[in-house]
A protein has these predicted regions:
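N-terminal signal peptide c-region/cleavage motif recognized by signal peptidases
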Residues: 17-21
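Extracellular/luminal recognition modules and glycoprotein regions
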Residues: 23-43, 73-74, 80-86, 162
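Exported/periplasmic cell-wall-interacting domains
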Residues: 39, 59, 71-74, 78-79, ...
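Short, solvent-exposed loop/turn elements at domain surfaces
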Residues: 54-55, 90-93
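Residue-level detector of beta-strand structural context in well-folded domains
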Residues: 42-44, 51, 119
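Hydrophobic helical h-region of N-terminal Sec-dependent signal peptides
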Residues: 9-15
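Bacterial N-terminal signal peptides that target proteins for export
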Residues: 1-8
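N-terminal, post-signal-peptide region of Sec/Tat-exported proteins
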Residues: 46-81
Length: 172
């Protein structure tokens, strides 16, 4: 009898979670939400003050992800686009990063020490990217040099959903 009660309780939790609008998709932490914005499906909207990235899915809906944003002195706002998508990217410090810390390595190849994590989605101008991270505890903070960090599971999901040319809007 106890086994049936335990099984019924477990099934209720699973069914409640699966039918919830905040259900986590594909192993990441994305939540599907109502999103009252007039943007095409596939548009990425970053709200730096919220530390959130929204992927518009259409029909008044969007997926929302928690992110890390640039330090206050490194933040930028405006329009861009997805210019390239890279799996297992190599990280190369920018000249400004190297000026701040000359001891940085020339580059870090794919692997657990790579600051870009498992995926990088390059944006159309500058050295800015939406990428994974090797410091997941930074998610929710203003910690980067202007890029947008995501948990690796989340950036892998986003990587599969966005296409080169997709519009990116970065808002306060």
């Amino acid at each position: 009898m106890q086994n049936r009660a335990l099984l019924a309780a477990f099934a209720a939790v699973v069914l409640t979670t699966a039918s919830s609008p905040a259900y986590s998709l594909a192993g990441g932490a994305a939540r599907e939400i109502s999103f009252a914005a007039e943007h095409d499906s596939g548009t990425i909207i970053v709200k730096t003050g919220e530390r959130k990235l929204y992927l518009v899915t259409g029909g008044g809906r969007a997926l929302v992800y928690d992110i890390a944003v640039g330090k206050p002195s490194e933040q930028w706002f405006g329009k861009s686009w997805v210019s390239k998508k890279r799996e297992h990217p190599t990280w190369t410090p920018t000249p400004s990063m190297r000026a701040r810390n000359p001891r940085l390595p020339q580059s870090i190849g794919p692997g657990p020490k790579n600051p870009l994590g498992e995926r990088a989605i390059n944006l159309g101008w500058g050295a800015y990217r939406i990428h994974g991270t090797n410091t997941p505890n930074s998610i929710g903070s203003a910690a980067s040099s202007g890029c947008f960090r995501m948990r690796n599971a989340d950036v892998k999901e986003l990587f599969e959903r966005v296409h080169v040319g997709a519009q990116v809007l970065v808002l306060r």
